[in-house]
């Protein structure tokens, strides 16, 4: 089989490496819009901008022609969109314009579209109505507790592919389920995508708590009550609340809220230290999806009539309406309730 990955950031590189370890030379293709980046990767054997120090497996094909990267795939192959959430709409529209037959398409981004609060699959469905030219593609999301750097070097990892198409799930497993990576399947696209979005916001909250030295008790409270918020929203949005107890919910939440490689956790730590959000984002150099989707998650919760106090406080902190220590006071000052 052949695999094409669109986007040569950290995740595109990591998953390209994972597929290349298993498939034949030339079967895996990585596309980037930047000719300079492709040249640097070709000359150095690594992605120094995103995954410095990690040598890519031999046999990976680099491509700068978008149309060629897509058209090399047959109906049994796999297209992976490895852009951030902010680039999903543009990328899928471009794919649909050049695709000549049905494709198996997955995305790696986690979050909601700003301004619309749409989930990734809803963005894809919207663009499909405009650009698909009558061709029906299979879609899905690949998500779970994983840092790109660890995947890039082949450390053990477990992910979940979510799709209404059993065939697509099988194609994704054929591409990535080998060596130190396990890929489970699910039909709960809503639950998987919302879990991946909300956990990023909660990881910022956990980082703030750790940065303010609130203790391990506080961290446990944030994660547990945050998980309850996640489950409520998933159920209200039409997903399965039990999905939140799996890899893409509590699994990804634990990793992102406690792991030192987490950009979202780092945002929380530095907010607690008194740094401004623009200053923090400039120092990161990469996307922290929780910053971009906190307001969108809050908007979706309001639309569905779901109370999410931790998420709401993070939106106020990130928008500059509330200081981190004041957010803690507001949360701790809430009226007592039955645990649910």
Swiss-Prot record:
The active site is at residue 199. It catalyses: sn-glycerol 3-phosphate + NAD(+) = dihydroxyacetone phosphate + NADH + H(+); sn-glycerol 3-phosphate + NADP(+) = dihydroxyacetone phosphate + NADPH + H(+). This is Glycerol-3-phosphate dehydrogenase [NAD(P)+]. Its EC number is 1.1.1.94. It comes from Polynucleobacter necessarius subsp. necessarius (strain STIR1). The gene is gpsA. Pathway: Membrane lipid metabolism; glycerophospholipid metabolism. Sn-glycerol 3-phosphate binds at residues 110, 144, 146, 199, 252, 262-264. The lineage of its organism: Bacteria, Pseudomonadati, Pseudomonadota, Betaproteobacteria, Burkholderiales. Its main location: cytoplasm. NADPH binds at residues 11, 33, 110, 148, 263, 287, 289.
């Amino acid at each position: 089989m052949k695999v094409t990955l669109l986007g040569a950031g950290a995740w595109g590189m990591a998953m390209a490496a994972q597929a290349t370890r298993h498939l034949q030379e030339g079967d895996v293709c990585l596309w980037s819009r930047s000719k300079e980046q492709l040249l640097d990767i070709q000359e150095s054997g690594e992605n120094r901008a995103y995954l410095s120090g990690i040598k890519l497996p031999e046999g990976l094909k680099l491509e700068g022609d978008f149309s060629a990267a897509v058209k090399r795939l047959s109906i049994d192959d796999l297209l992976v969109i490895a852009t951030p959430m902010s680039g999903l709409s543009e990328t899928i529209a471009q794919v649909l314009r050049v695709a000549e037959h049905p494709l198996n398409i997955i995305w790696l981004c986690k979050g909601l579209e700003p301004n619309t609060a749409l989930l990734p699959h809803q963005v894809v469905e919207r663009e499909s109505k405009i650009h698909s030219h009558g061709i029906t593609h299979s879609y899905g999301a690949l998500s779970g507790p994983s840092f790109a750097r660890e995947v890039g070097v082949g450390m053990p990892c477990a992910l979940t592919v979510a799709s209404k198409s059993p065939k697509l799930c099988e194609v994704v497993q054929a591409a990535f389920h080998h060596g130190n990576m396990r890929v489970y399947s699910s039909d709960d696209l809503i639950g998987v995508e919302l879990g991946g979005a909300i956990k990023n916001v909660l990881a910022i909250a956990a980082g703030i708590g750790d940065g303010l030295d609130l203790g391990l008790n506080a961290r446990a409270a944030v994660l547990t009550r945050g998980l309850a918020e996640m489950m409520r929203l998933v159920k209200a949005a039409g997903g399965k609340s039990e999905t939140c107890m799996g890899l893409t919910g509590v699994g990804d939440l634990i990793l992102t809220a406690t792991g030192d490689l987490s950009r979202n956790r780092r945002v929380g730590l530095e907010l607690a230290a008194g740094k401004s959000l623009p200053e923090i984002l400039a120092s990161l150099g990469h996307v922290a999806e929780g910053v971009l989707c906190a307001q969108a998650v809050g908007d979706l919760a309001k639309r569905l009539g779901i109370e999410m106090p931790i998420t709401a406080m993070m939106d106020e902190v990130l928008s500059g309406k509330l200081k981190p220590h004041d957010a803690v006071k507001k949360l701790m000052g809430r009226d007592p309730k039955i645990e649910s």
